[in-house]
Structure formats: structure tokens, C-alpha cells
């Protein structure tokens, strides 16, 4: 174990969801929450896209293939995973530098850094019945293969700057083209980092800049929020009294960007963002915004100026899918952390995490993991158990975690299995952990799946009944022996503060007003 990878204490369990907090609005929209409004506005979904109001949304040239796991509009794993990003950018979606007047609206200073201070993974099932939105703190400390240990909000900028330098060396001089191509590299780097951290495959990408946030908020006439206490924090420009109030675009941006002088820092800022988005949906869906031509025009202009989505995303069909979410359930959550006052390699303050625990959290939160059976509940009796000596197991590593296949193989050997081979999977062939067997209901494969935490079994007709291939990708969160290197995926030195166990609320569009927050 190298010095930069230090042991970490047991992670604090992720907070349970508290009782749903009602938001003001017409009852028909009671279960339509922040997620819907953000995607509706950012990717021109319901309403104005459906009637052709927006046709100029920028598309990033991202290697998502129109959604890696999307076929005929449906995700192969049953749900679409979207990476939603708020970029601290001083240029628009077309790469043009913002005007002095527009920069003044942002209250964010003149320094160009392209940090991604809002990172959220959103899962929408194919039937549109529910959705889960998981926030990733901006200071989450990760290991990147190209740039080492760093905060996740700096990944975008690191890859963007490197690509920009390469393009300039190649003779590119057009500023707009430079900016656009460099940003695409930043997006690719962030997509890979989020996939490694969460263990999921990103199907689609949506990004909005600071200007877009201001313009979208102003387009709907402002958003109502509520504060527990008055705040005056000059770094973000947040200067608001306690209680309920309606904020315009610039003030709303300060409201969701403040993290200093808050009890839990970035974690409280995430709560603000989630509460703001819940109020936004009420403003959009209960005030006739989508039937107001003037507001639709303003929304269309805001989207065109500041929103980027991945190339190949069929927005029209996705908008139709979102309409079914009105009667469903949307939940907000935040990834579990090991501390909020950790220390990075250069002494900087960071949020520390354990990748294994984050993978497990996403499997449970996004409905990908089956709960472990209770003692005595296993349906397979002793006389039905397969003869371990007959099983030939191959273990392939399709992740970035060095030694993962060896750790899994050692775990299976301890259980009595014969390991025929360990090695690396062909690059790009597998994105999710799985077990390959002759048949999906193979008793031998089922036994190995149970031993490894419930990995899905995929039938492969080229295999005989005694051969099983275990593929461990970035989402693997099952057991391993100590021979693996999964524990080395924790970086930074955890601090003493794991944050107060404040429950994550579920928001809906009903009730008497916005939830008051710190």
C-alpha cells in the first residue's frame, strides 16, 4: 500500500429518507419533484420542446453512443442513468465568452476555472414510474488515473485545460472552437470519473452553466425558498433574511452556491440545491409557465445559450417518458462519506469517501442490488448444492482497481472453487460486473453469484455447464479476499467530522410552501 492510500475507518451508514416534505402547488403535481423540473428546463423536455420551441440545444461530442446501454429508447438494465452537471463556466454552450454584464450577473468573480460544483446522478426507469437523484459533494476526493488524487469538481477543468493546450500546439486558434473541443474533453474525463466512483454506466449527460441557471430562474419569474436563519456570506454573495422569500436569478445562484458559514459545508449546500429544485418545479408546473408564450420563449433562449447534452440523446422520446413520472416517486440522496473535514495530499480540505461503500450505496439506492438472504432462508438445500470440484472458474478484471480479479479469485478459492484463470478483460467489452454461464439458471453460476453478493448471470452458449466466467467491473461491491487492492481506492486522510446524521428529505409539489433549510 502506497503512502497516498491510507486505511479508513468504517463508513457512517447513509441517512434514511425522512417523511416527505410537501411543496406548494396544485395536487396534480404532488409527486413531480426537482429532478423533473431541472431536466424539463435544461434539456427542453416537456412543453416547449414538444411543440418545437427549442431546436438549438448544444450537443457535446461525447463517446456515449447515444447512451451506451440504450436501445430503442429503453435502457438495457431497465433504467437510464443521467449525469447532470452545473459548470462554473464563464462561456456559453457555444464556447463564446460571456459579456461583462452577464459576468456581473453571476457574482462569481473573473477567474475562469470551469469547476463542476454541482454533480448529480439521476436514474429514470424505462416505465417512468420513479426516479432517484444522488448528489456528489464537490470536494469528494478521488483518484484519477491521469491526474492522481484530486477533488472531483476539478476533473472537468483538468482534462479541459490539457486538451486545450494540445489543440493550441496543433495550431488551433479559433477561440470558440478551442473552447468547445476542450470542454468536450473535460466532460469525457468527468463522465469516466463519476463512473469509476459510482460503479454505474453513464447513459446520458446534461450540463448547464452559471449563466443558464440565472436565465432559467428569471424566465420562470423567480423561485421561492425558505431559510432557518438570516445569512450574510460575501464569498457567494448570499445576503438574505430568515424565512420565506422569492429569489431572482442572481440571488438564487448565490443561494445555491453558498457553502461557507453553513454547519455542514457542502452537504448543507446540497440540501439547498435540492430544496431549490423542488420549489422550481412548483413554479414551473403550477403557475402556467409551460402555457405562457413569453416565458416559453425566455426558457428557450436560456436553454439555447447555456445547456449542453450528449450527442444522440433522443430528447423527444425522453420527454414522453418524463410525463409518466407525474404519478411516481422521486427521491433525493447524497453519497455516503467517511468525513467532511479530511485532508488531501497538499493539505487541502476534502470530503473523503470509500469507493467500495459508494458502489454498494448506488447498488442499493438505484435498485441494482438484492438484499442478502437471512440465515436459513436460502432456497437451495444442501443436497442441491453443486459439486465445487466440477466448476472451472475464470475471473476477469474489467475495472481500474488493480488486483481486483486476484482478490475475487482468492475469495472463491477459500470457498472451495477451482480457479482456472485470472486476468484482465478486453478493454471496452464489459461495463458492468456479471457472471457468464451456459444458462441463466445454472446452479453452479447461482452459487457463485450468491457468494459474490448477487452478481447478475448472463447466458453464454459458447460455455459448457462446468465453466463459469466472473467479470468484475467498476461497479463491483461484493466480497474479496485480502489479496485484492480495493481498499487502496480510498485516498486522503479522513478527519473527525462525518457530518450530522441529518436525514435526506423527499420533496413533492404539494403542501403549503418550501421547506426551510440552513
Swiss-Prot record:
Coarse class of the protein's main subcellular location: membrane
Signal peptide: none
Stretches in topological domain Cytoplasmic: 1-31
Chain spans, region Disordered: 485-518
Subcellular location as annotated: Cell inner membrane
Biological process, per Gene Ontology: cell wall organization
Periplasmic side: 53-518
Sequence similarity: Belongs to the LytR/CpsA/Psr (LCP) family.
Assembly: Forms homodimers and homotetramers.
Variant or mutagenesis effect after changing residue 257 to A: Does not complement the growth defect of the lcpA-silencing strain
Membrane topology of this protein: Single-pass membrane protein
Keywords from the UniProt entry: Cell inner membrane, Cell membrane, Cell wall biogenesis/degradation, Membrane, Transmembrane, Transmembrane helix
Domain-related comment: Both the C-terminal LCP and LytR_C regions are essential for function. The N-terminal region is not strictly required.
Pfam hit, one: LytR_cpsA_psr
Disulphide bridges: none
Function: Involved in cell wall biosynthesis. May be responsible for the transfer of arabinogalactan onto peptidoglycan. In vitro, has pyrophosphatase activity.
Protein name (record): Cell wall biosynthesis protein LcpA
Listed GO CC annotations: plasma membrane
Transmembrane spans: 32-52
InterPro entries according to UniProt: LytR/CpsA/Psr_C (IPR027381), LytR/CpsA/Psr_CW_biosynth (IPR050922), LytR_CpsA_psr (IPR004474)
Mutant lacking the gene: phenotype: Essential, it cannot be deleted. Conditional silencing of the gene results in severe growth defects and drastic morphological changes. The lcpA-silencing strain contains significantly less mycolic acids and a reduced amount of arabinogalactan.
Keyword Chaperone among UniProt keywords: no
Name of the encoding gene: lcpA
Organism: Corynebacterium glutamicum (strain ATCC 13032 / DSM 20300 / JCM 1318 / BCRC 11384 / CCUG 27702 / LMG 3730 / NBRC 12168 / NCIMB 10025 / NRRL B-2784 / 534)
